[in-house]
Amino acid sequence: MTAPAGPRGSETERLLTPNPGYGTQAGPSPAPPTPPEEEDLRRRLKYFFMSPCDKFRAKGRKPCKLMLQVVKILVVTVQLILFGLSNQLAVTFREENTIAFRHLFLLGYSDGADDTFAAYTREQLYQAIFHAVDQYLALPDVSLGRYAYVRGGGDPWTNGSGLALCQRYYHRGHVDPANDTFDIDPMVVTDCIQVDPPERPPPPPSDDLTLLESSSSYKNLTLKFHKLVNVTIHFRLKTINLQSLINNEIPDCYTFSVLITFDNKAHSGRIPISLETQAHIQECKHPSVFQHGDNSFRLLFDVVVILTCSLSFLLCARSLLRGFLLQNEFVGFMWRQRGRVISLWERLEFVNGWYILLVTSDVLTISGTIMKIGIEAKNLASYDVCSILLGTSTLLVWVGVIRYLTFFHNYNILIATLRVALPSVMRFCCCVAVIYLGYCFCGWIVLGPYHVKFRSLSMVSECLFSLINGDDMFVTFAAMQAQQGRSSLVWLFSQLYLYSFISLFIYMVLSLFIALITGAYDTIKHPGGAGAEESELQAYIAQCQDSPTSGKFRRGSGSACSLLCCCGRDPSEEHSLLVN
């Protein structure tokens, strides 16, 4: 029988012609839809979107993923706490050694003086350089810590020695401020002096004439101040972190790469002095700890975490896959039987964002745990990467708990409000970001030379965000007030800049932002509001009047069913989704 002519038939052909269909035939099926088939599809759709409690009432199958997520939260949190204690000791050890190096090698250093520590005369600069090298040579006698020298080690700047004292300067430089003339060749030349540490502990400090000639050659250093770019001192030291014994772990061996920089690139008469370190962790050779406890329990616990997260990953991935298959079946059915194309937003309703979040957390946890095992075995030293992986995964695991709270109306306020308000908030933030970036660039260019909080774009953004929250408001104004004598015009501009920003963002932008959230909350409180509107998919599922306790979802429930797959199931239930 031919299709009926007329607008309705043409419209049907137009909808069916462009795409051959989601695994279905290109043309409409001449057979009318069978009510049992459609009712079965509705029932399976309703079961798919049920909560774990309703699924238990419908088929009597226990919410495996819910129980597994509870177990995973416990083991992942305990693992994070154990690793956090170990990581805290490692970070503290590196920070304390860096502070100790600054007090040892920087002449006249005091805590908190990193930004203001500098040399202002030639004598001060020479004294600071020689003091650092002298302290390096006498380190075994003056240091409270146990350090060992590293000779060479493959670094190009040491040239086989323990310490490299280098000055970098322009190839040719002549500056005559009196005549306002200069002649500069910007090519930078590097000259280094290698200093070797003593082969044995040095004599008491009173005997200054017994230093080796190779070690005292640095005293002949002559700096080319008129074209000097910077002076650097490179060396490496070894030490052992014994704090890890507190956590029943084998101590780590550290190699600290120390860089002392005397920066003269500004040629402003002030040479800032800084000391930076990089710590490299490696396994100690022949470690021996008397009565050291067995570490197998920690390894066994990490294996349990990996197995738990792997099982969670498989269950959530299976649910995502079955949701995708059910989506294709629903799309094909509606296209084949009703000639209707399902929109993208309706198809996205089959994609459970909570499962994607849990899958992501499982991947991060497994990766972080494997890295943690390598760190404890002293094969890896990436504490920072491991902490980021484990910390992010734990955050996602705890956020995933909110999914199960959304099944209860009284606990669903937060998620429902965010879901309703998110589109409006995103559009609002896009408009606000344009104004915010404009203020950032303007403040950086105009106020940067006069205000320490506006020296870089990142600092400007942090300062403005603090002003929105009402933090450091007086301090920001006071710091600009101190610069009034330098430029009255800039001070006047700063007042207009700060007052306009604060007025705009606190009294208007922030108030409107809060109003959007409040409006979304009011919407979900009223049943007749926009937040209560149903999609076409939800309306289609609502036509199924079967309750979870009706028994109609239990067909074939007596078949053997394992945790990951079902065997011997009834053919009519081959598409049933066991989503907890």
Swiss-Prot record:
> What does the record list as GO biological process?
adaptive immune response; autophagosome maturation; calcium ion export; calcium ion transmembrane transport; cellular response to calcium ion; cellular response to pH; iron ion transmembrane transport; monoatomic cation transport
Effect the entry attributes to changing D111Q: Modulates inhibition by Ca(2+) at different pH levels but does not abolish channel inward rectification
Which keywords does the record carry? Adaptive immunity, Calcium, Calcium transport, Cell membrane, Cell projection, Corneal dystrophy, Cytoplasmic vesicle, Disease variant, Disulfide bond, Endosome, Glycoprotein, Immunity, Ion channel, Ion transport, Lipid-binding, Lipoprotein, Lysosome, Membrane, Mucolipidosis, Palmitate, Phosphoprotein, Transmembrane, Transmembrane helix, Transport
- Which Pfam families does this one have? MCLN_ECD (PF21381), PKD_channel (PF08016)
**Region of interest (Disordered), residue spans:** 1-38
Q: Where in the cell is it found?
A: Late endosome membrane; Lysosome membrane; Cytoplasmic vesicle membrane; Cell projection, Phagocytic cup
Please give the annotated consequence of changing L577A: Abolishes localization to lysosomes and leads to expression at the cell membrane
Outcome of mutating L144K, per the record?
Disrupts tetrameric assembly and abolishes lysosomal localization
Cite the effect that the entry attributes to D471A: Fails to rescue defect of lactosylceramide traffic through the late endocytic pathway in ML4 patient cells
Q: What is the effect of changing D362Y?
A: In ML4; affects channel activity; abolishes Fe(2+) permeability
Record comment: activity regulation: Channel activity is controlled by multiple regulatory mechanisms in different subcellular compartments. Channel function is transiently modulated by changes in Ca(2+) in a pH-dependent manner; pH changes modify the aggregation state of unitary channels; a negative cooperativity between extracellular/lumenal Ca(2+) and H(+) is suggested. Regulated by phosphoinositides in a compartment-specific manner: in lysosomes activated by PtdIns(3,5)P2 (Phosphatidylinositol 3,5-bisphosphate) and at the plasma membrane inhibited by PtdIns(4,5)P2 (Phosphatidylinositol 4,5-bisphosphate).
Region of interest (Required for palmitoylation and association with membranes), ranges: 565-567
Q: How does the protein associate with the membrane? A: Multi-pass membrane protein
Could you tell me what this protein does?
Answer: Nonselective cation channel probably playing a role in the regulation of membrane trafficking events and of metal homeostasis. Acts as a Ca(2+)-permeable cation channel with inwardly rectifying activity. Proposed to play a major role in Ca(2+) release from late endosome and lysosome vesicles to the cytoplasm, which is important for many lysosome-dependent cellular events, including the fusion and trafficking of these organelles, exocytosis and autophagy. Required for efficient uptake of large particles in macrophages in which Ca(2+) release from the lysosomes triggers lysosomal exocytosis. May contribute to cellular lipase activity within the late endosomal pathway or at the cell surface which may be involved in processes of membrane reshaping and vesiculation, especially the growth of tubular structures. However, it is not known, whether it conveys the enzymatic activity directly, or merely facilitates the activity of an associated phospholipase.
The protein's name in its UniProt record: Mucolipin-1
Supply the source organism for this entry: Homo sapiens (Human)
